[in-house]
Amino acid sequence: PKAVGGSGRFADALVDALHAQGFTIAIESNGTIAAHRGIDWVCISPKAGSEVVQRRGNELKLVWPQQGSDIAAMEGWGFDNFLIQPMDSGDSGVNESNRKAAIEFVSQNPKWRLSIQNHKLLGLP
């Protein structure tokens, strides 16, 4: 796996040092670069049209709707959890439509669960 911005030895040392101090390491990525082997929780949120190389992890989170996403291929990837999150467009009408589309998607695709951003529902930045 690649380490962003440096050698794998540096990433190994950093991960080992954080673990030695009792930290749990979690990342969220678009998946275009492989996650370091020592990461404890890997969440991948792919963007349509990108080449996803990290196809294993704890959580695959797809922002919905997202045209061009190959759902069937994604379902074959090695993730523990498959999540759909309604896209936040900044427009309340569009957001309502996106929420309905996400709910409809998970109701028709039992492998996927709904994920929401609670801070946005509460009006927090």
Role assignments for model-derived ranges:
Residues K2-P125:
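Conserved AdoMet/S-adenosylmethionine-binding subsite of the radical SAM
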